Amino acid sequence: MKDNIHPTVYKAKLVCACGNEIDTTSTKGEVVNVEICSSCHPFYTGKQRFVDTAGRIDRFRKKYAKFSK
């Protein structure tokens, strides 16, 4: 490996907006602030909402039906 081309790796602490702190490594710095983490993300907490795409698909098909004929 070449000398002096690799970034410095720090022991970092990810600090989430919800207050959760995670210890990891990073090249960005010693403290990295994030907006969302696994303890507050809706996918991991089970509080995700269902997005109804059926209406959107029907509107798309209706809008572009004239081009398929």
UniProtKB/Swiss-Prot annotation:
This protein's record includes keyword tRNA processing: no
**Cofactor(s) recorded in Swiss-Prot or TrEMBL:** Zn(2+)
GO BP annotations, alphabetical order: translation
Q: Which of this chain's residues are annotated to bind Zn(2+)?
A: C16, C18, C37, C40
Task: Name any GO cellular component annotation.
Answer: ribosome
What does the entry comment about cofactor binding? Binds 1 zinc ion per subunit.
- GO terms for molecular function, please? metal ion binding; rRNA binding; structural constituent of ribosome
Sorted UniProt keywords: Metal-binding, Ribonucleoprotein, Ribosomal protein, RNA-binding, rRNA-binding, Zinc
PANTHER family assigned to the protein according to its UniProt record, in alphabetical order: 50S RIBOSOMAL PROTEIN L31, CHLOROPLASTIC (PTHR33280), LARGE RIBOSOMAL SUBUNIT PROTEIN BL31C (PTHR33280:SF1)
Biological role stated in the UniProt entry: Binds the 23S rRNA.
Q: Which family does it belong to?
A: Belongs to the bacterial ribosomal protein bL31 family. Type A subfamily.
Q: Subunit details for this protein?
A: Part of the 50S ribosomal subunit.
Its recorded name reads: Large ribosomal subunit protein bL31
Organism, as annotated: Oleidesulfovibrio alaskensis (strain ATCC BAA-1058 / DSM 17464 / G20) (Desulfovibrio alaskensis)
